[in-house]
Amino acid sequence: MPPLGSEGRWFTDASGRVVIPRGVNFVQKWAPYTPEAAGFDEDDAALLADNGFNTVRLGVVFGFLMPEPGRIDTDYLDSIERTVEILTGHRLFVLLDFHQDGYGPATHGNGMPEWATLTDGLPNPPAQFPLYYVQNPSIQRAFDNFWANRAGPDGVPLQEHYATGMRSVAERFATNRHVLGYEPMNEPWPGTNWTPCVTGCPDLEAQLLEPFYERMEAAVRSVDAIHPIYEEPFVLFNFGQGDTILPGPSARSPRDVLSTHVYALTAADDASTMDRSVAAAERDQAAVLVTEWGAVNDPAVIERLADQFDERLLPWLFWAYNENVVHDSTLPLVGDNLNEAVLDALARPYPSAVNGIPTHFSFDETSAVSTFEYSTVRPNGRRAPRALTTTLVLPARAYPSGYSIEIDGADVVSDPCAQVVQLRHRPRASDVSVRVTPGGC
């Protein structure tokens, strides 16, 4: 069994509890190439765990993994593995993300190696993220050729090399029970024919993305039978104007997961992206995880988006630890090196594991009042066994002077004033409600 399976739109653990992933991204896009070389170590993992997070989306860069056609850089993979071991040693889940932006360095982006960047000599102006997707013909043609599976310089199709890279990563982590799975490509771009995707492009998803994900899943399954694939729509889905056909209906096990990002231009469109994410997951009975959002230092924006996620019971991973939370992991995580305001906004109460189905959770930043409700019926329709507990995370940053807790339908079975509260529902309780207020411990 993997660390997390799924039942409908929910992640579930081996005991059947609903699990809510919540955490951050760490992607080392450029030199010094790995999180380890950039200074990410035990102190960083401890900071995340101590503030209530349980998941990290960790970048794997194909250009570093396969710097030459067919050659896996095992030193790079060894370094990624050491970082995974640090994270899992702090009981953090890890999602391995094959990351790119703007295709690769040869087109002024990051991710893909130069040998896999086939632009057919089109103009390559130095446009900046994210406008380079629509302003740089070389980026568009590089994606066209990747989706067409053109042969690389050695005559081997590009996606075959890419699948070899995915297989090497999956083989390395096939038995790691804290790895959540593999995301084949961050924010894929449709290529030259991108305009239909502004309002949703099901035909292009079926033509380009579905075969790609099937090919990557086959590569993973050749060495790893337990970890799911995280399927992400084309990047224009992020703006909330169109739907996705992903991940699609399936009876396969493990079930593919829907990975989405929320980067719309208004609060209403952010809500639209979230609602479309939930609707797609519920339609296909697949788990959903918002694997990126944020990329800002404004606590008010972070809190507004976090409130919107809570309203929809959506799990999330903030972008990004190494851009918005910590400035330099080679230095002590104190003072100006730590963005306390961002960390304060992110470290919110939430249920990390629910012995039943969560039906509501919220946190009022002004009053520091948190409310949480859940049903004691599981996603599979069966009653949750009382032997298991529900876990409520109450970070010290949210309650620096402690907290008081009122509960209807359950009892606290953990130590008083703990930051991680364990609840056991009462014998006849069909629903549990929790209200947390500041002060009291």
Show the residue positions of the predicted features.
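Aromatic- and acid-rich polysaccharide-binding/catalytic face
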Residues: 180, 186, 232-233, 244-269
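Active-site mouth of glycoside hydrolases
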Residues: 3-21, 25-228, 233-245
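C-terminal beta-strand-rich structural cap/linker in extracellular carbohydrate-active enzymes
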Residues: 348-357, 361, 417-441
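Structural detector of well-ordered beta-strand residues that form the stable sheet scaffold
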Residues: 95, 230, 257-259, 289, ...
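Short polybasic amphipathic segments
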Residues: 8-13, 330-333, 405
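Substrate-binding cleft of secreted/luminal carbohydrate-active enzymes
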Residues: 22, 235, 263, 267-351
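Acidic (Asp/Glu)-rich catalytic clusters
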Residues: 46-52, 171-177, 246-257, 277-285, ...
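Surface beta-strand/loop "capping" patches
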Residues: 337-415
